[in-house]
Structures are given as structure tokens and as C-alpha cells.
Amino acid sequence: YDRVLTMGQDTLLVLGRPDEPLLQMLLEAASDLRVVVGDRMEEMAPAAPDATLILSWSATRELLRDVLAVTPHLRWLHIMSAGINHLLSPELAATPALLTNGRGAFSSSLGEWVMGAILYFAKDFRRLIRVQGEGRWEPCDVTEVKGQTVGIVGYGDIGREVGTRAHAFGMHVLGLTRRGPATPPPGDPAEAIFGPAERLDMIARCDYVVVTAPLTPETRGLMGAAEFAAMRPDAVLINIGRGPVVDEQALIAALSQG
């Protein structure tokens, strides 16, 4: 498609290449804007000085940094993802434009993904796929998730979506927040909400530990040696947050030690 797609008074730079169905939806929603789409600086450069809006669809840190340096009239920058750590730069920190992100937009989808991961381990899908590929059948033992316990580290929007689906499967749901302990509000899927001081106690109760916490200075390495030591030997760790929330070396050591 052409780089300049629609014409209007305000200019929207879309940093990335949306798939065609999503692109058409975007163009319909932005029909009164001049829309420029691309993933290279040379595509953005002609329109950047007049741009008032930026949609970071799948921009790299370098592309966003370079575009911000030449958009003096920018009023609004929206980043599609919930996390923005991968895009941080001095230019981003200094922009006076309104900055928004996709927080909450992916909660339902991630909740479904976590349940898929839980069932993957409970029903041993990896082995089933392997023997299917080998063209043979063999009996297998699987577990039910009903009655098992899932602990959610970072019990926010995404965590509650996970909890809602886990509760629907008959699982016991425990949440961990930095402001806990707290009494779950009426209708909440969690049976208990723990605070940082109780995190090891919560983790020790769990068949599945799901990490949904954002990456901050306080959460970097949140899941470390003490947390892995508290987990049951047969417990499963599922991390859908940022990688550095889990201390990778401590995880490797815990797995090596069985």
C-alpha cells in the first residue's frame, strides 16, 4: 500500500506495518486524518514535521526515538503494547505530548493464553503431540485442574482475567499485590489476596504460579531463589510478564537442582 494513505488536517504517523484487515479498520476510524504508515525513518521523514499524532504499532526504540526528534507539533503518542520498557529513550521521556498505552486491551486474550498453558501441562499436550507425530497411541495419565490452586503474582487487570477463567475451571485462585494483604471484593475470583511479606506462603500453596507483574525497579528479579525454593517440586511457573521479573539464573539453578 502507499505510504500516505488518507488526507486530512491532522497527520497520524503509524510506526509499523499493521496486517491488512487491521489497517483497513484503522483507516476507517481515522478517515478525517492524514495517515502515513511505515517502519523506516525515510518513510516517516517527509510527514514528521507536521505530525500531531503517533501510533506506535510495532516500532523499534530507534525508530521511535528518531521520529520523536523531528515531530515538534506532536500532541499525542499512543503505544499499542501494555509495556513500554522496550521503547524507553531520553526522547520519549522528554516528550511533552500525551502518552498512552494499551493497558487492559490484551487482558482477556492473555487470560485465555494462561489457561491454555495450564491445560498444556495438566493434560501433557507436549507428549500427546509427540506420539501423534510418531503415528502411535499410548495410554497416559493426566491431571484435572479442578481443585488445584493457581497463584497470581501481580494481581491486576490481567491477573483478574486469569483468575476469572481459572475459577471457572474450578481452581482455587490466590492473588499477590504490592498493596496486600487485602480482602477480595465481592465477586472477585480470588479466595485471598496476599502482600509481599506473605508471598512465599502463597507460592508454597500453588500448583501453578502465574507471573503477570509489570517490570519496575521493585519487581526486577521478583521471582528469585527464595521463591523457587518455596515452590512445590511439581509446581509450574508461567510468566506472561516481562522476562527480567524472573531471575533467570536462579530459575536455571532451581531447575538443575530438581
List the predicted regions and their residue ranges.
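An N-terminal-biased, well-structured beta-alpha scaffold segment characteristic
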Residues: 1-98, 224
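Phosphate-coordination loops involved in phosphoryl transfer and adenosine-cofactor binding
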Residues: 9, 146-149, 225, 234
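Conserved N-terminal Rossmann-fold NAD(P)-binding element of oxidoreductases
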Residues: 15, 151-154
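Conserved beta-strand positions in the Rossmann-like core of class I SAM-dependent methyltransferases
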Residues: 36, 174, 244
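A short, aliphatic-rich alpha-helical micro-motif
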Residues: 45-49, 68-71, 145, 201-206, ...
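Short beta->alpha connector loops at strand-helix junctions that form conserved
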Residues: 57, 80, 98-104, 197, ...
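Rossmann-like adenosine-cofactor binding region
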Residues: 180-258
